[in-house]
Regions:
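Contiguous beta-strand/loop segments that form the cofactor/metal-binding neighborhood of enzyme cores
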Residues: 1-161, 165-214
Length: 214
């Protein structure tokens, strides 16, 4: 095992940079809370240091269709020097280091794993504190969830049916960056309808004797 994963995972042959690392943790929050699944398009932009390596500055935008709970929306990921603007000085982005900003019609929510700050547009008269029934389930913790699943057969919160789609979603950003173009995404068939040339980045042909079925 070679340590320093934040170095070697920036080479495409060995990893997928922060999109394959912290994005799985941070994008999980809006992906879970807003019931996101497969995007309709993805536009990944970055300033690569070298064709073989993950860019040092990244911005990726996915478009998600509406569902019965919410309208369509854009989800944008930033890493490196490029950062989103903050709607107010109340939000100290640099003090957080990393987090998620939800921007809605009536206000904003800035959150990470331990902190949540709400700022409303206008006064507070239209604000109703969420009821307990409106909250997403809390995790028991990785180890307790695993034991609970073994004993009851119940799925873990981040089971493969969920996490597989989340990782697929994030990796589409890496494919878009490497393609240098916005991709129109057909999730059912796992292909970019406007860029057949990226198929080798989506499906890998394994050497004879090394086959992965799935």
């Amino acid at each position: 095992y070679v340590g320093s994963c934040l170095k070697w995972n920036r080479f495409w042959d060995f990893g997928t940079g922060q999109l394959g690392d912290m994005a799985s943790h941070l994008i999980d929050l809006p992906y879970w809370a807003l019931d996101l699944r497969s995007p309709t398009s993805c536009d990944g932009q970055g300033k690569p240091m070298h064709d073989d390596s993950y860019p040092g500055e990244v911005k990726v935008t996915w478009k998600h269709p509406a569902n019965d709970k919410r309208p369509g929306l854009d989800l944008t990921w930033y890493d490196g020097p490029v950062k989103p603007g903050m709607p107010s000085k109340i939000f100290d982005r640099d003090a957080m280091g990393m987090g998620v900003l939800f921007s809605g019609e009536k206000g904003w929510l800035l959150a990470d794993y331990s902190m949540r700050t709400v700022m409303l547009k206008g006064d507070m008269t239209h604000y109703d504190a969420p009821a307990a029934t409106d909250l997403i389930p809390r995790s028991l913790g990785h180890h307790k969830e695993w034991i609970h699943a073994c004993k009851t057969g119940a799925p873990t919160l981040c089971n493969f049916d969920y996490s597989g789609l989340l990782v697929e979603h994030n990796m589409l950003g890496a494919v878009s960056m490497r393609a240098g173009k916005k991709l129109e995404w057909d999730a059912k068939n796992l292909r970019a309808t406007n860029a057949p040339e990226v198929d080798p980045l989506i499906r890998k042909t394994y050497r004879e004797g090394w086959v992965l079925n799935g």
